[in-house]
Amino acid sequence: PTLCCTLFPYTTLFRSKPIIGCEVYVAPRKRTDKVHEYDAAMYHLILLCRNEVGYRNLCFLDSAAFTEGFYIRPRIDKELLRQHAEGLIALSACQSGEVPRKLLAGDYEGAKAAALEMRALFGEDGYYLELQDHKLPNDPAINQGLIRIHQETGIPLVVTNDAHYLRREDAEMQDTLMCIQMGKTVDDPNRLRMETSELYVKSPEERAALFPDYPEAVENTVKIAELCNMDFQFGVHHLPEFKLPEGYTDGDAYFQKLCEEGFARRYPGAPAEYRERLAYEMGIIRQMGFVDYFLIVSDFIGYAKRRGIPVGPGR
């Protein structure tokens, strides 16, 4: 979430439409199950934000994956997906997705059932089966199975491509970086490496050429992009509402009271210029619209001090 907020404003400079999403890991059982024999083989799933509701749900899922489901990797489960599917579009993911993995295992009916379950969660236009061709040995079998599921269920197809680098010629550079990361050499035959140089950002023409019999699957990339309309309101403060004590209906009046009490306690008999400075600082806070913020900070700082919790200086 932090990175997408950082990059989001720059998309207008390049006249591009940002699609906010995440590849998540889905636990094969429950996110709280952590028995290696059963729970190490998690599934991949792509989640894209249609709108602000979807963004909030994605943020919740991402947080829960780390705080509740972390086992080897941060994981969610289908229970969480059922509760937080609104505003999201799901894609079946790469060979590590649940549907492709069941197809590779020869369990066509299981793959079909998993796809139907996802469609039930995300809606008729909220779940897509990904056709990919990275020139990997298993690609044809997976694609044939996905096309069959599409024909029998009507779940739409979409042409996608895993992108680990920008251009095809960058494959060697990425391979070298992986060696550096894992402390291996490029001539080590047993090291982890990508099995193809097709994991780059392909043009629309290249993707269409890979699946000439399924033009609608290529067109669905545009359809999905049109369904995703997430925007951020930068420069607008979204503070929680501060609950005022009994007898106050105006935060500004309560802010004034606290400042006056604190000033009298710290500076009894202070000269006039001190009071002028207080009025100036309070005016700036009001002008910036930060009265509620200062009340909130004052509240939790006071709570900490009353309970002996150390409080550091503000920055």
Language model: regions and residue ranges:
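Phosphodiester-processing cores and adjacent nucleic acid-binding clamps
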Residues: 7, 11-315
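Short, well-ordered junction/capping motifs at the entry into regular secondary structure
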Residues: 1-3
